[in-house]
Regions:
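Ubiquitin-like/PB1-type beta-grasp interaction modules and other compact soluble beta-rich domains
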Residues: 1-82
C-alpha cells in the first residue's frame, strides 16, 4: 500500500485529502503514478495535468522519474506562491 496526500487547491478539486491504495503493478515511478491517477474518473485528469504541481515522496521533493515503492507516502501540491 502507498499513502497518497493532496494539499491546498488540489485537495479541494479532488475532494479528498489522503488515501491508501495498493501500489499498481504497472507503476514504478512518480510519472507512472500520475498517469495511473489521471485515468480515474472525475476530476483527476485535469487536476493532475498542471505541469507546475510539486510532488514529494516520503516528505522529500522529487522529480517525475523517482521510484515509488510499497509503503511510500506520495504528496501532491500546487506550487507555493507568496506576496
Amino acid at each position: 500500500m502507498i499513502r497518497l496526500r493532496y494539499f491546498a487547491s488540489l485537495r479541494e478539486r479532488l475532494g479528498v485529502a489522503d488515501e491508501w491504495i495498493p501500489l499498481p503493478d504497472a507503476v514504478s515511478d512518480v510519472e507512472g503514478l500520475k498517469h495511473w491517477l489521471q485515468d480515474r474518473t472525475g476530476p483527476w485528469r485535469e487536476a493532475l495535468s498542471d505541469q507546475r504541481l510539486q510532488v514529494a515522496v516520503n516528505q522529500e521533493l522529487v522529480k517525475a522519474d523517482t521510484p515509488v515503492r510499497d509503503g511510500d507516502e506520495v504528496a501532491w501540491f500546487p506550487p507555493v506562491t507568496g506576496g
